[in-house]
Amino acid sequence: MSETHLTQQKFADLPLCDEVKQALNENGFEHCTPIQALSLPVLLEKKDIAGQAQTGTGKTLAFLVATFNHLLTTPVPEHRQLNQPRAIVMAPTRELAIQIAKDATLLSKHSGLKVGIVYGGEGYEAQRKVLDKGVDVLIGTTGRIIDYVRQGVINLGAIQAVVLDEADRMFDLGFIKDIRFLFNRMPGAKERLNMLFSATLSMKVQELAYDHMNDPVKVEIAPEEKTSRNIKEEIFYPSMEDKLKLLHSLIEEDWPEKAIVFANTKYQCENLWASLEADGHRVGLLTGDVPQKKRLKILEQFTQSELDILVATDVAARGLHISDVSHVYNYDLPDDCEDYVHRIGRTGRAGQKGVSVSFACEEYALNLPAIEDYIKHSIPVTSYDRDALIDIPPPVKIHRKPHAGGRNLRDRNGSPRPSGSHRSGSGRPPRHDRTRRHS
């Protein structure tokens, strides 16, 4: 992480218990990010927090450190039962819950506290077996948590710490009734440490906070700009005929280390995956129709750089925490201005440079004025040479499984690529040496 995203505040100087400090030290966490430096002193005084912070600011570590420290310094509730967790973390998506659980497991190493995760889509009985053994910190999506609560597998009567992550997304996805259902089955707000984090502290989010929290302190780490200066933005105006060829051509020219391609519909995402797969790219598809086990496998492959490109819808990508994304391609301009910010925010994180490429086609160009008004700047326009667009092969059938082998380095004619022409660690030339960009 770049030092520009850290403060002078050291975790070692905070009044944290030794078990938490040891875990932080072993995982290389020395200095706090701004949201950690502002929120942890408040939380360590056992005061509630309503925090405004974007994804990638370190908020997950902030609330996990506070949660573990609180449980380790607070007596266990008298007569606590095996099915009663002491802390609960609610997340809007399975992928976000999984990421939080991974981070929590690292912090729990020396604490003696057990972490459990529950989410819909798979593993109902396996998750239940873990809960039956008892967990201290429960992390999950609200729907699956409610299922277990209603069956008596989980009882929330001993909750001492609550985290509601990405509260604004909870509203977007219609989960607020679920959240209120769970809050109403916990001890009163004054009997627990309450933490809420959201990209925006809208009136509805603040109302939720004040309804179920104990006079929370508002902590805001709002970026001065909607989009990071680390992200180079550009926009093309392709014809519908050129649009797919342009995407292929730019990917071949940029040869991104790790890229996400966004489209507005599942149908379009499937078409893009089929086309990129046919061209030999290592590409994964992430939509709401992809089974959960396959989703997790695709995310693991993308995170481990076994896949280079991920094609996704906005809903499927919400809550994903993937580092080192070099490029974001907006094949369709989103209808929601905030989605544009969320999309391109996948790159340029933690001080790294990123590239965002958007297409303003005939169908979605009308979305551009609202987006530029929202981000308060114009997106630089880049033209392209139609004659330089590469030919693309017919798409594979949608039902075909993603290619599991190495990246296909063949040229357009299907012959092997010359050994000296592919990219290596740095300074690697593009697949074709004709540039398509014309400033």
From Swiss-Prot:
Gene: rhlB
Entry's Gene Ontology molecular function annotations: ATP binding; ATP hydrolysis activity; RNA binding; RNA helicase activity
Keyword Cell wall biogenesis/degradation included in the entry's annotation: no
Protein name: ATP-dependent RNA helicase RhlB
Subunit and partners: Component of the RNA degradosome, which is a multiprotein complex involved in RNA processing and mRNA degradation.
Pfam families (UniProt xref): DEAD (PF00270), Helicase_C (PF00271)
GO terms for biological process, alphabetical: RNA catabolic process
Superkingdom field: Bacteria
Function: DEAD-box RNA helicase involved in RNA degradation. Has RNA-dependent ATPase activity and unwinds double-stranded RNA.
Annotated Helicase C-terminal domain residues: 243-390
Family, per entry: Belongs to the DEAD box helicase family. RhlB subfamily.
Key words, A-Z: ATP-binding, Cytoplasm, Helicase, Hydrolase, Nucleotide-binding, RNA-binding
Domain Helicase ATP-binding residue range list: 40-219
Coiled coil regions, renumbered to chain: none
Catalytic activity: ATP + H2O = ADP + phosphate + H(+)
Chain residues that bind ATP: 53-60
Cystine residue pairs: none
